[in-house]
Amino acid sequence: MRKTDHVFKNQTHHVPASADRIDSRHTWVICAYGQSPYLEDCVRSLLRQTVRSRILIATSTPNEKIRKTAAHFHLPVYVNEGEHGITQDWNYAVSCAKTRYVTIAHQDDIYESIYLERALKGLRGARHPLIFFSDYYEIRNGEKVSSNRNLRIKRVMLLPFLSRLLQNSIFVRRRVLSLGSPIDCPSVTYVIPNLPEGPLFDSTYRVAQDWEAWERISRIRGTFVFDPHLLMGHRIHEESTTTELIADQTRTKEELSIFRRFWPERAAGWIEGKYRKGQDSNRM
């Protein structure tokens, strides 16, 4: 038994047999690429949701592994035949869904069975929701890590979002984002009709495209719906794209460009230098 199996079986809630609700307003889009050994675990975590919705796979690297996994779970596969790249693949994934709510599920990650149930509850409670996001844990070497320096810093940054009133404040969310990005991209569900038309992510970014998107969305009137429960597990491993891009300093360059949207040049450089130390938490 792989360690990843151990994490999945012990950290994911079991769905009651009576959980047969289907929500036609939501779609899970799994971004799949290469030969990930974790893809099936991701799919199973979505199938175990207490509220069911549509699941599909989007990929720019079709292969036998992805095809067999899709066939085994009876999932449709959408192939991106246009421009490739991590950001382009995310935009393509969003375009494959035709529902009000869309969650981009990263193939290496897993979701607690109550994720969608809590997401829909939170979104229904907001007058004009923009995105939903939750707290999360990391998966390192097959083990669940609920707290480390990086996670603790992010949770402190997210404290203002515990207030439903402050979730609606453009000022507050921009002050939070001016210090970095505490929002974990795989934990986000997008309310597509309430977001600007056009690509959700800027294709000139390769690793900070999520933070760049939050910065643009933060200017819009509406709600950043936050759930403090640990509703998903984000896998950290050497082969991940994020880890590779940190190694070649891509993230440093992109994050500095975003800090400049909030701060004068010298202040942006100083803050980025402090923020860069947090990148070490994404290395194995």
Task: Specify the residue positions occupied by each region the protein language model found.
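Conserved donor NDP-sugar-binding/catalytic core segment of glycosyltransferases
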Residues: I114-K154
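N-proximal low-complexity "stem/linker" segments adjacent to membrane-targeting elements
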Residues: M1-S45
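A conserved acidic beta->alpha catalytic loop
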Residues: A58-R67, H106
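Acidic donor-diphosphate engagement hotspot in glycosyltransferases and nucleotidyltransferases
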Residues: W90, Y111-A119, G142-E143, Q209, ...
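Conserved nucleotide-sugar donor-binding catalytic segment
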Residues: V29, P160-R251
